[in-house]
């Protein structure tokens, strides 16, 4: 029932309304605006790397692990609805705000008309620094799947096995479940969350991690090639999934996941081979520009 409905009923409308305003004002005092270039919340949201970020009434909500953020944007002015301490301690790194994306965009070969168009279209995308365990599960789910279904599967798992939380503005949400929460399940238990055959991948990985035979903390210290090789020891993790985890969780920006979209681009535009040497140290960011462009760009004019 809306607040207007409560007032019409005579059920102590002043107290209800004043409490709501007081709570809202208290929340919105913890907010500030940063000017950020090469940053677009909409582009990030639909870039296929994060599945718990949603547009809501002109702003975006992000759930990362057990954290919740509301954030909005007007041009280069980005408003974070949290305090400075939380921003500096978590969200600044999460959104990769210390990386010079202007320099990366400037490094794109001007003679490469396809890549110039892709980078221009996706210039607001950033590689998020997301939780390792969450990305392992998410990209296991991503196999032979599409973005809306992946999003639904992730949310189903969180609602079924994650801890219920409440944000500062009163919004209820579910944290991403820890490995221990999934390790005790039967291999087909996540079928109810619409994971299909991927259910056994997630449960077996959860058991291996919860049991201590796969060390997430050690993985975080490895270089790209070591990390990829270690990830490939997990049941259900292949080359593409390992590269996605390396890129979106470990921030190994030389990781270059190749799915159907990227393979088609490589075949069509880079028959002699993609110039990895030119983009060494940020090839994964270039890959994300290509992926975004293939999903959302106007390819007819390329």
Placement of each model-derived feature along the sequence:
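HhH-family (HhH-GPD) DNA N-glycosylase catalytic core used in base-excision repair
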Residues: 25-302
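Accessible peptide chain termini
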Residues: 1-2, 31
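N-terminal amphipathic/hydrophobic targeting modules at extreme N-termini
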Residues: 3-17, 24
């Amino acid at each position: 029932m809306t607040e207007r409905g409560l007032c019409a009923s005579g059920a102590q409308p002043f107290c209800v309304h004043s409490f709501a305003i007081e709570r809202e004002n208290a929340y919105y005092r913890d907010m500030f605006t940063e000017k950020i270039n090469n940053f677009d919340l909409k582009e990030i949201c639909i870039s296929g790397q994060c599945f718990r970020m949603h547009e809501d009434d002109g702003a975006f909500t992000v759930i990362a692990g057990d954290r919740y953020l509301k954030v909005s944007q007007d041009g280069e002015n980005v408003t974070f609805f949290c305090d400075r301490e939380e921003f500096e301690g978590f969200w600044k790194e999460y959104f990769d705000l210390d990386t010079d994306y202007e320099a990366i965009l400037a490094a794109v070969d001007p003679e490469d008309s396809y890549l110039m168009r892709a980078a221009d279209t996706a210039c607001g995308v950033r590689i998020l620094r997301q939780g390792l365990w969450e990305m392992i599960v998410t990209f296991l789910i991503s196999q032979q799947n599409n973005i809306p279904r992946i999003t639904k599967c992730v949310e189903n798992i969180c609602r079924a096995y994650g801890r219920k939380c409440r944000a500062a503005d009163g919004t209820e949400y579910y944290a991403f479940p820890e490995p221990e929460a999934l390790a005790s399940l039967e291999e087909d238990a996540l079928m109810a969350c619409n994971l299909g055959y991927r259910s056994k991948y997630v449960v077996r990985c959860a058991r291996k991690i919860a049991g201590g035979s796969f060390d997430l903390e050690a993985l975080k210290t490895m270089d790209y090639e070591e990390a990829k090789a270690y990830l490939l020891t997990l049941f259900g993790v292949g080359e593409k999934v390992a590269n996605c985890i390396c890129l979106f969780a470990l921030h190994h920006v030389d990781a270059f996941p190749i799915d159907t979209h990227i393979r088609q681009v490589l075949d069509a535009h880079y028959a002699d081979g993609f110039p990895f040497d030119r983009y060494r140290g940020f090839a994964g960011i270039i890959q994300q520009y290509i992926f975004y462009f293939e999903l959302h760009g106007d390819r007819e004019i390329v």
